[in-house]
Amino acid sequence: MINVLQEKTYIKMNKCVLNFKNDLNKIRANRATPELLDNIFIDYYGTHTALSKLSNIIIENNSTLKISLFDISIKNSVEKSIINSNLGLNPISSDSNIRIKIPALTEQRRKDIVKIIKNDAENTRISIRNIRREANIQIKTLLKEKEINQDIEKQVKLEIQRYTNLFIKKINDILSIKEKELLTI
């Protein structure tokens, strides 16, 4: 029972960190990454479909993405979706491909993005602490129901606190790396 609780707590905390990391990967620095287009969807024969499912997206060079569509008939829809995505990207159409030149970030925009990711990091830390709180409540319930004794309660609470410290450190490390990446010209 306790092992399952510890394992579930670890898995939930790990998911929070992975989601945070995935969200940060979508935020661009001065490099073109295919993940930048992960949130672009196209209405493909009545189905809301991710661009990545309808094309190959490759890095052509440091500042250019190349989209090779599987179905050329959706090229106009893809271009409109990219323009309407509020990512500040302008697609350039050529034969069956679409190229996207990633514009350089201004210093002010970099600072704004850093503020946003710091806020996201804090929200992720709060989620980690809430998971810890939920686990501690479950531990107290088990103690009240006499399914565990006080020694086990203390051991498990310490272990969950170690998880909390570990994942908050991971969040801080990921944030630090992304912050340096964004502020480096």
Curated annotation (Swiss-Prot):
Record-annotated membrane-spanning stretches: none
Record bears the keyword NAD: no
Keyword Protein biosynthesis attributed: yes
InterPro entries xrefs: Ribosome_recyc_fac, Ribosome_recyc_fac_dom, RRF_sf
One GO location term (cellular component): cytosol
Subcellular location: Cytoplasm
Record's protein name: Ribosome-recycling factor
Species this chain originates from: Buchnera aphidicola subsp. Cinara cedri (strain Cc)
Gene transcribed to yield this protein: frr
